[in-house]
């Protein structure tokens, strides 16, 4: 199982909307994430900086973000979220990978 961590940026004032949209995650997106090998996925919010910290555990060799980028459902989700996050020209969230420096099982 591979572990991935990354950070994203939430626009100020949208923390409740971000949480609401994720609490209503589309069933087809939930399935797509699971089918791409993600077995554990959490997102945390730093209220002082509006930085979102994502953590995933992924089975197999694929980086789940690469798999998701090719998926139409994911692209629709990106469009849906683009008004409340920093995004790239294709509306994917600006995602900065983080390097693991310690792990303890």
Regions found by a protein language model. Name each.
Residues 4-9:
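Active-site-flanking beta-strand signature of metal-NTP-handling nucleotidyl enzymes
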Residues 14-39:
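Short amphipathic alpha-helical segments
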Residues 10-12, 60:
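Beta-strand elements of well-folded, non-transmembrane domains
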Residues 30-53, 57-59:
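Short, glycine- and small/hydrophobic-rich beta-strand elements in well-ordered beta-sheets
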Residues 1-3, 49:
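A general secondary-structure signal for short beta-strands and their flanking turns/coil
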Residues 103-105:
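A hydrophobic membrane-anchoring alpha-helix module
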Residues 36, 58-96:
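An amphipathic, aromatic/His-enriched active-site/gating alpha helix that lines ligand/cofactor pockets
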């Amino acid at each position: 199982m591979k572990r991935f961590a990354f950070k994203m940026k939430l626009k100020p004032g949208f923390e409740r909307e971000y949480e609401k949209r994720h609490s209503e995650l589309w069933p087809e997106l939930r399935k797509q994430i699971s089918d791409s090998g993600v077995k554990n996925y959490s997102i945390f919010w730093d209220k002082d900086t509006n930085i979102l910290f994502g953590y995933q555990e992924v089975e197999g060799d694929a980086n789940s973000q690469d798999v998701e980028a090719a998926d139409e459902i994911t692209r629709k989700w990106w469009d849906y979220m683009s008004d409340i996050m920093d995004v790239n020209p294709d509306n994917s969230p600006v995602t900065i990978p983080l390097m693991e420096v310690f792990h303890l099982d």
